[in-house]
Amino acid sequence: MIYKKHWNSFLNENKKKEIASIICVNDEQRILILRRSKTDKHKADFWDLPGGHIDPSDDSLEAGAARELQEEAGLNVSMGDLTYVTKRELHKANRYIFVTTKWTGDINLKPNPKTDILEHDDHKWVTIEEIKELEQSIIPNYILRKALDKIKNE
């Protein structure tokens, strides 16, 4: 975890955008995925994990991931229930992946509170094998396997 006193310098020094995503795994070992809405400029109709950009107002990567899960899916997670999985270095961003098996609330896809745009228009709980079959998925299977291994070892 990056502590609050170093947080703003971390965000400012790093020229890449910081993104955090959460892999929610239910009791049947199914993973929550969200379909990006048709209004998405880059990946309309693609399936992805809940997540998004870290804001300077977020206290940590975990706090940003938890906020994004609440904004995008209506689920609440305690930062203590998040387990770090990996960091993916993308061309213009660093994507930090967390996994959890504990959350509260019911799925409620709602517009982004800042833009009032519906970012996702559908959700489903799937196995890794089912994700492989999706033609429009941007979720790497090796990350999902790594996340499932993490929760098995807890």
Model-derived regions, located:
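Charge-dense, intrinsically disordered terminal/linker segments
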Residues: 1-16, 27-28, 154
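Conserved N-terminal beta-strand and adjoining loop/helix that marks the start
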Residues: 12-32, 53-55, 85
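Short secondary-structure boundary/capping segments
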Residues: 14, 23, 39, 46, ...
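A generic fold-level signal
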Residues: 15-17, 26, 41-42, 92-93, ...
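Short, charged/polar surface micro-motifs in flexible loops or helix N-caps
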Residues: 25-31, 39-40, 91, 101-106
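Unchanged
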Residues: 53-79, 85-139
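Charged phosphate-binding loop/patch that engages nucleotide di/tri-phosphates or the phosphate backbone
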Residues: 140-154
